């Protein structure tokens, strides 16, 4: 007859907790935002906050955010922004479906889906953006010249 080792349970608990923390991802700490603005990793965290309240199934297996979008010089295509694509690798179809292309302002955390020129919004995102702007000293009005580079009109 098999017997369970009581000590294996105690080993399993810390391992399960470590796995849960690793899977949960990081949460942007506004105090870590520098006056120069968001890093690529921080901008991706802002995007994830914005996407939580959209109609995307982010927990679906195969969903990904690609944050390595660069021009031929290795720079982000839109100055003052980091660009990310959101997509889904469908294992049954053997295909990748892209759901959107998003730009996140390094100075304010402003988030746009640039294919549809839709500014993402939500109370949690606005609160985070307020904290980012407090750290950078920038406002949405300050970044209007960079925002024009997205090719999208400001929304009322």
Model-derived segments and spans:
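Exposed beta-strand-loop-beta-strand "reactive/processing" segments of non-cytosolic proteins
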Residues: 59-107
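Short, non-transmembrane alpha-helical segments in secretory-pathway proteins
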Residues: 28-72, 135, 139-142
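C-terminal partner/receptor-binding element of secreted or periplasmic proteins
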Residues: 116-156
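Bacterial N-terminal signal peptides that target proteins for export
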Residues: 2-13
């Amino acid at each position: 007859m098999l017997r369970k080792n009581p000590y294996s349970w105690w080993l399993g608990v810390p391992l399960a907790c470590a796995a849960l923390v690793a899977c949960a991802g990081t949460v942007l700490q506004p105090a870590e935002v520098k006056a120069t603005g968001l890093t690529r990793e921080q901008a991706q965290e802002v995007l994830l906050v914005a996407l939580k309240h959209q109609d995307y199934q982010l927990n679906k297996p195969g969903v990904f955010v690609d944050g390595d979008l660069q021009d031929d010089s290795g720079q982000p295509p839109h100055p003052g922004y980091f660009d990310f694509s959101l997509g889904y690798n469908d294992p049954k179809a053997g295909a990748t479906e892209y759901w959107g292309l998003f730009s996140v302002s390094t100075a304010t955390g402003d988030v746009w889906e640039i294919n549809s020129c839709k500014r993402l919004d939500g109370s949690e995102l606005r609160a985070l953006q307020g904290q980012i702007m407090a750290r950078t000293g920038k406002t949405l009005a300050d970044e209007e010249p960079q925002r024009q580079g997205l090719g999208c009109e400001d929304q009322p």
